[in-house]
Amino acid sequence: MIIYLDLDGVIINWVKGIFNWFEIPYDPSKVTHWDSIQELTNNTKQEFWTKIKFSAFWENLDFYPDSRLFIDRIKKYGEVILLSSPAYGCAGYRQNWIEKNLPEFFNNGHYILTPSKWTCAHKNTILIDDSDENYQKFIQNGGNAIIYPQPWNITREIFKQEMSEQEKNNLVIDTLYLMKNQIRSN
């Protein structure tokens, strides 16, 4: 079984990186939908992406506090491959981040950088991602997927109260356990 693990919004606190980059006081509760960030930074979509197209931004993003433990827990269920959709023109920066922060994945080539995550989907794969679109396309193309709970995706309708990172990780691990057993029995 291959478990594809998204980075931004799952193990990397991309939102905090944005708040820091634009010198906005960090308040993740203000990010309530996918385009919140552009609105909070008072930029058009194009302006926003242009302003973060720098190595200093992408290469210095921080993990969520429990991310390394989360990765170790996921490894118990299959081969973990990082699957990231870097911003246009920033793939090299993402690769540098992986080399610096997750050298075991970098050195073993256990990462894929593509905006078309759905191309990795097949019946023995599970994607863990915070994007509704990536989640849906992965399933539509024959893979299995778990949506990582974040206020900007469909889980906001299910979980009305804010969840801690540990609660999110535990929910994903529990779902991964059930999903792996279901895949095994099919």
PLM region descriptions:
Residues 1-49:
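Active-site neighborhood of HAD-like aspartate-dependent phosphohydrolases
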Residues 83-128, 132-137:
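Substrate-recognition "cap/lid" segment bordering the active-site pocket of phosphatases
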Residues 49-56:
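Short glycine/proline- and acidic residue-enriched helix-loop micro-motifs
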Residues 58-62, 67-98:
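Substrate-recognition element of Asp-dependent hydrolases with the DxDx(T/V) motif
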Residues 99-113, 158-186:
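Structural recognition of alpha->loop->beta junctions
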